[in-house]
């Protein structure tokens, strides 16, 4: 080690995998949501065609968009687990955020734009409403199925928030597992959308005025646009490269500073590649060590300590650097 530089890079074994809920659970959550959404979308489309309801057709578009989203999220989870290669030495972890970003576009275009357009058309030109009986039945069944899908996601979220000792809001705001976040937001939006569609149908039925149905459709579109914005913002941030939360960075800094051969951490950089894939690079002022072997041992000891403190860390690069005068 002629340049007084040490780099410690390793991949965790199974015993260290405590940094996230695991890809398997996220895949199951996405598959359950996708299957529910596809069945619901077909039923809503039939009900919308029979009743002539703009809100029901908007809900059908909503569910079809959610189904496309789940397919893209499934691809993101599968492709991001491919091992590192010569062209991608840090792996393919961030590919999950590319597919998830495309999924947010599907939600916006396939759900929000269609719903707002159909709602505005109804508000301007009206519509002929048929019997809403089938629509009410489909809405009730869809509410049950969406609740089942959401309950599965909530169970996963509770497990993660309990393990990490954080609130649900904080976890959803900062999590790098955007697939689970997407399913949670979409299922929650779906339940709200069903209530809006029910209100629009009921208002149109009681008053004979399709304005209520068109207004419900526009509100559903606005809700989907908000979901798409939140998911696009988060995935774009992670795709560009986002650091660990400040609490985790403080834990890493404190862990390094606590090592017997470390004087202090001069600089620390973290970068998230996935829920269980984080890179750490730091300039560290080590106590004067006489040999390269001693530097290597100090770096190895510090790396192991960092990975114990924050199990999501997969790569640690330490640069022995003297303090600047």
Task: Show which residues each predicted segment covers.
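Topogenic membrane-insertion module of multi-pass membrane proteins
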Residues: 1-42
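Alpha-helical transmembrane segments and adjacent TM-loop junctions that form the membrane-embedded core
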Residues: 2-5, 13, 93-325
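Alpha-helical transmembrane segments of integral membrane proteins, especially early/N-terminal helices
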Residues: 23-32, 61-71, 98-110
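Residues that define the loop-to-transmembrane-helix transition and helix capping
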Residues: 27, 53-56, 210-214
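Hydrophobic alpha-helical membrane-embedded segments
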Residues: 38-46, 51, 63, 67-73, ...
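Acidic (Asp/Glu-rich) catalytic motifs at the cytosolic membrane interface
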Residues: 49-82, 116, 120, 181-195
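Aspartate-rich (DDxxD/NDxxD/DxxxD) Mg2+/diphosphate-binding motifs
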Residues: 76-95, 125
């Amino acid at each position: 080690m002629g340049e007084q530089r040490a780099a410690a890079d390793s991949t965790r074994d199974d015993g260290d995998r405590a940094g996230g809920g695991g890809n398997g659970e996220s895949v199951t959550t996405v598959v359950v949501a996708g299957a529910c959404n596809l069945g619901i979308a077909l039923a809503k489309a039939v009900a919308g065609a029979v009743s002539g309801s703009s809100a029901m057709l908007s809900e059908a578009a909503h569910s079809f968009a959610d189904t496309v989203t789940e397919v893209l999220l499934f691809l993101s989870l599968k492709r991001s687990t491919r091992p590192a290669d010569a062209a991608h030495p840090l792996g393919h972890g961030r590919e999950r955020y590319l597919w998830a970003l495309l999924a947010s576009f599907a939600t916006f275009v396939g759900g929000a734009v269609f719903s707002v357009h159909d709602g505005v058309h109804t508000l301007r030109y009206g519509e002929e409403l048929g019997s809403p009986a089938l629509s009410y039945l489909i809405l009730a069944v869809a509410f049950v199925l969406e609740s089942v899908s959401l309950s599965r996601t909530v169970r996963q979220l509770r497990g993660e928030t309990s393990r990490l000792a954080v609130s649900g809001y904080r976890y959803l705001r900062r999590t790098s597992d955007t697939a689970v976040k997407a399913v949670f937001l979409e299922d929650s939006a779906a339940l709200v959308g069903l209530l809006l569609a029910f209100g629009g149908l009921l208002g149109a039925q009681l008053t004979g005025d399709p304005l209520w149905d068109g207004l419900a459709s526009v509100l559903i579109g606005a809700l989907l646009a908000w979901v798409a914005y939140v998911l696009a913002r988060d995935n774009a941030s992670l795709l560009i490269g986002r650091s660990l939360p400040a609490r985790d960075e403080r834990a890493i800094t404190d862990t390094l500073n606590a090592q017997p051969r470390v004087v202090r951490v001069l600089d620390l950089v973290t970068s998230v590649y996935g829920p269980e894939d984080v890179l750490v690079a730091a300039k560290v002022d080590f106590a004067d060590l006489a040999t390269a072997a001693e530097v290597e041992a100090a770096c190895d000891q510090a790396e192991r300590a960092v990975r114990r403190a924050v199990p999501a860390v997969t790569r640690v690069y330490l640069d022995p650097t003297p303090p600047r005068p």
